[in-house]
């Protein structure tokens, strides 16, 4: 049983990239689907597909690599808030990730979004992870 599904999601993506895999399969949930959509919108993954397997479903993610150097597009996936120590922030408290080059994913009352979207809507929430 997985106690932290977001950390499991990030670890699966990180391990697949370190192993050079093109596609990674992750058990689906609504939160993981939204995080995947954000990764796609920010340009960190090539494409994704949700598959229903008559249980909870799967998310298939096509990972993105640099054409010349074969380096992964995602340099780091860092879990911030965890079950034992939740991290909340108001719009004024959002930290810049890698001097503005990265993105923080935040769970707000308006849904899961990036830190920039949360700041523009003036809502705070739980900082789930940093990606750069």
Question: Language model features by range: what are they?
Answer:
Residues 1-132:
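Core subunits and conserved enzymes of cellular information-processing
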């Amino acid at each position: 049983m997985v106690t932290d599904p977001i950390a499991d999601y990030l670890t699966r993506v990180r391990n697949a990239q370190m192993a050079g895999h093109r596609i990674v399969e992750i058990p689906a949930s609504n939160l993981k689907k939204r995080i995947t959509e954000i990764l796609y919108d920010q340009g960190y993954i090539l494409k994704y597909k949700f598959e229903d397997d008559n249980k909870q479903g799967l998310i298939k993610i096509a990972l993105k690599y640099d054409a010349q150097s074969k380096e992964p597009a995602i340099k780091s996936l860092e879990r911030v808030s965890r079950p034992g120590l939740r991290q909340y922030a108001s719009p004024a408290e959002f930290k810049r990730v890698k001097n503005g080059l990265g993105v923080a994913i935040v769970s707000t009352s308006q849904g899961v979004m990036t830190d920039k979207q949360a700041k523009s809507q003036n809502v705070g929430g739980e900082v789930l992870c940093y990606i750069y």
